[in-house]
């Protein structure tokens, strides 16, 4: 009997180890910055607005992180105004969503699994296009490259969350491809203000520009 119990414990420990090991590998892959192909030099380059990870499972009714929940109303109001401004100027709006298809990761937490309510866009978010990019990080999905090239985009305006994670990896991947990046600073949130400040300072040193949401209409083309 003791031997059976011992084997049960060993098997359970191995299962837990495999699950959490898989989760760590998944998170590491999600944070990896893709290289991509440098963009073409478009004669009349255009802009696009990226809305990153504003979803039911991050800012909506299924959200778990208190910092995101507290910031969500203000964030979504700002982003919706930016979406309106972009639409008025025929600037493409692209919605980037995190979703998890890894079966083992979903055994631990399936709140953002593919097709789940948590993976859907936050219902408060204004949707004006059918440009949806499911991803672990935005440029990990080649659809984003295709949309930007088809629309001759060479400048990206960034909104959403989290400054220290998906927003950061998306910006880094965009820089690798030669895009000009402008972060709309008051329309990006993070788990902590200190993390946001730290990431923004590092990105400034790489040539990323920052502006307030009120400056967006005058700057966009």
Regions found by a protein language model. Name each.
Residues 2-127:
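Active-site acidic carboxylates
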Residues 167-175:
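Short Gly/Thr/Asp-enriched flexible loops that form oxyanion-binding sites at enzyme active sites
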Residues 90-91, 152, 178:
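Glycine-centered short loops/turns at secondary-structure junctions
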Residues 115-161:
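Internal catalytic-core helix/loop-beta-alpha segment
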Residues 56-57, 99-103, 138-139, 162-165, ...:
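Solvent-exposed loop/turn segments at secondary-structure junctions
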Residues 46, 117-132, 193-221:
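Structural recognition of alpha->loop->beta junctions
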Residues 157-161, 179-193:
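A short glycine-rich beta-strand->turn/loop micro-motif centered on a GG-aromatic cluster
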